[in-house]
Regions:
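Basic, polar low-complexity surface loops/patches
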Residues: 1-100
Length: 100
C-alpha cells in the first residue's frame, strides 16, 4: 500500500482534491475523503474497507482511471492522479454505510 502517513495527512485536511494511487497490485485506489468525493462524481465504484495491521481501517474505492473525467484532472503521473472536486457534506454518514 502507498505510504499510509502521506495518505492520512492529505485526507485529514482534504478540501476538494481527489487523490488516486496506483498500488503494488497494479490497481488504482482512492481513500477516505477522496473515495467519498469520487463516489459523488462517478457511479459504479467498488467501495470497501481496507483493514491495516488488523486495527485501523480506511474507506477505499477501486478506480478505473480510464473512466476519470479528464476535465477534473489537476495532475497525474505513473503512480498518482489528483483531481479537483467541489466538496459536499455527508462524509461521515457515507463512511458509516461502507460494508466490511
Amino acid at each position: 500500500m502507498c505510504e499510509v502517513v502521506t495518505i492520512l495527512e492529505r485526507e485529514l485536511n482534504n478540501a476538494g482534491l481527489i487523490y488516486i494511487y496506483q498500488e503494488g497490485d497494479g490497481k488504482w485506489y482512492a481513500y477516505e475523503q477522496s473515495a467519498f468525493y469520487l463516489s459523488q462524481m462517478m457511479s459504479g465504484l467498488s467501495l470497501g474497507r481496507y483493514i491495516m495491521d488488523g486495527t485501523l481501517w480506511l474507506a477505499r474505492a477501486e478506480v478505473d482511471v480510464n473512466l476519470l473525467p479528464w476535465e477534473n484532472i489537476v495532475s497525474y503521473s505513473k503512480t498518482e492522479y489528483v483531481l479537483h472536486y467541489t466538496p459536499h457534506n455527508g462524509f461521515h454518514e457515507w463512511l458509516a454505510e461502507i460494508k466490511e
